[in-house]
Amino acid sequence: MAYSQGGGKKKVCYYYDGDIGNYYYGQGHPMKPHRIRMTHNLLLNYGLYRKMEIYRPHKATAEEMTKYHSDEYIKFLRSIRPDNMSEYSKQMQRFNVGEDCPVFDGLFEFCQLSTGGSVAGAVKLNRQQTDMAVNWAGGLHHAKKSEASGFCYVNDIVLAILELLKYHQRVLYIDIDIHHGDGVEEAFYTTDRVMTVSEVSMVNNFPGTGDLRDIGAGKGKYYAVNFPMRDGIDDESYGQIFKPIISKVMEMYQPSAVVLQCGADSLSGDRLGCFNLTVKGHAKCVEVVKTFNLPLLMLGGGGYTIRNVARCWTYETAVALDCEIPNELPYNDYFEYFGPDFKLHISPSNMTNQNTPEYMEKIKQRLFENLRMLPHAPGVQMQAIPEDAVHEDSGDEDGEDPDKRISIRASDKRIACDEEFSDSEDEGEGGRRNVADHKKGAKKARIEEDKKETEDKKADVKEEDKSKDNSGEKTDTKGAKSEQLSNP
């Protein structure tokens, strides 16, 4: 049994596929999967890989996806490509694919990897093989049953929660993205087995849901919790409402597992955001949730100033590991884009915090009133546990030779699309391109990087065949382990 007792260090498993950063939504689109590669490269160079198990996720199958999504919708996602869009014009309109959710090369494979990591993490938690599972490629909370929305196509969160519900009577979903987690709330709006808690920007109108009065319906009444925030909320104000609300939710609902969506568009300076949180303020949410010592699935989400997304998710990985990391960034493949300060942490802006103490207290009291309406810990009639979505002893789904797979390091260096770094084009001169003062240090760091290249290559996530017994053969990579998870 992997669960840690008390407040000790947790066992953490982390899901990453080196191909994830290759997918490209298109020129000018704010969603950039490359941010996940930047995050991975940064946490590798901080040495965090030594402290957790790293797994390459399986590609989720259409069968797995249709446990929530409609057959027609998933069939459409499997079929649509940039070169055959004209044949699917009616379906594109029907399924809301085309503008915010464009068709791009490898769209379905991208969805498979995003979903595969989240579902595999849920399976690990169910099997009590880890305390926390991390999939920064997941957290795509806007996708609906038969519709793409808000840059999201397949709702990996809903699918992961459905997996957790096989073993857990009650699952708590917490969303700290600036945009409302509408797709997840909608999926579980009429059940008491999942409580959804989401902070929402009142001004950033997309997706237009998440009102304080949206509390669930039927059996799910009072099991949806939304707290709308005004522009400019800072670390102090956010902490004053997040901790007491989550503590009250834990007291009343008593979940046995938690899913935390860590959308980073609530950070100060985000291209699409209007909040003023620092990386530390954002990560405080992870710290608060960790204190309850429940199985925890941590997922990505929004975040459109990608260098800050990489900072945030790297730091939150360290928080999950109870690991202190220095503010000075280590040299990495994307070092120049963290200028001009080359630091891990960011400073808040001087924007006005429109969340007055009176407003915050009013919101908090309204939420407490709703939570008091909850019966304590609703019971669930226990049934036979369904089969896990992912089998440990299943074979390689694509039959590829893992030894011939290009390394993540080589892939990182090969992919260099200038468009991926357009998140700061409105910041004027200076900005992150001012690297002159760091050339000497960077040169020295490059030498050190070359010396440890062999060691870092060992941290590249590889597929490997599983031995016939269920224990599986693992490769010694100084703490980084890889596992091939494939179709049931």
Curated annotation (Swiss-Prot):
A Pfam family hit: Hist_deacetyl
Keyword Cell wall biogenesis/degradation on entry: no
Skewed-composition ranges (Acidic residues): 418-428
Ways its activity is controlled: Inositol tetraphosphate (1D-myo-inositol 1,4,5,6-tetrakisphosphate) may act as an intermolecular glue between HDAC2 and N-Cor repressor complex components.
CDD domains the UniProt entry points to: HDAC2
Key words of the record: Chromatin regulator, Cytoplasm, Hydrolase, Metal-binding, Nucleus, Repressor, Transcription, Transcription regulation, Zinc
Region listing for Disordered, in residue ranges: 389-488
E.C. number(s) listed in UniProt: 3.5.1.98, 3.5.1.-
Function according to Swiss-Prot or TrEMBL: Histone deacetylase that catalyzes the deacetylation of lysine residues on the N-terminal part of the core histones (H2A, H2B, H3 and H4). Histone deacetylation gives a tag for epigenetic repression and plays an important role in transcriptional regulation, cell cycle progression and developmental events. Histone deacetylases act via the formation of large multiprotein complexes. Also deacetylates non-histone proteins.
Residues forming coiled coils: none
GO biological process entries: chromatin organization; heterochromatin formation
Gene: HDAC2
Catalysed reactions, semicolon-separated: N(6)-acetyl-L-lysyl-[histone] + H2O = L-lysyl-[histone] + acetate; N(6)-acetyl-L-lysyl-[protein] + H2O = L-lysyl-[protein] + acetate; N(6)-(2E)-butenoyl-L-lysyl-[protein] + H2O = (2E)-2-butenoate + L-lysyl-[protein]; N(6)-(2-hydroxyisobutanoyl)-L-lysyl-[protein] + H2O = 2-hydroxy-2-methylpropanoate + L-lysyl-[protein]
InterPro entries with a match to the protein in the record: HDAC_PDAC (IPR050284), His_deacetylse (IPR000286), His_deacetylse_1 (IPR003084), His_deacetylse_dom (IPR023801), His_deacetylse_dom_sf (IPR037138), Ureohydrolase_dom_sf (IPR023696)
Family named by the database record: Belongs to the histone deacetylase family. HD type 1 subfamily.
Protein name per its UniProtKB record: Histone deacetylase 2
Disulphide bridges, residue numbers: none
Localisation per UniProt entry: Nucleus; Cytoplasm
EC class of the enzyme, as a word: hydrolase
Chain positions recorded as 1D-myo-inositol 1,4,5,6-tetrakisphosphate binding sites: 28, 32, 271
SUPFAM superfamilies for the chain: Arginase/deacetylase (SSF52768)
UniProt biased composition (Basic and acidic residues): 402-417, 429-481
Cofactor(s), names only, from the UniProt record: Zn(2+)
One Gene Ontology term, aspect cellular component: nucleus
Gene Ontology MF annotations: DNA-binding transcription factor binding; histone deacetylase activity; histone deacetylase activity, hydrolytic mechanism; histone decrotonylase activity; metal ion binding; protein de-2-hydroxyisobutyrylase activity; protein lysine delactylase activity
Organism: Gallus gallus (Chicken)
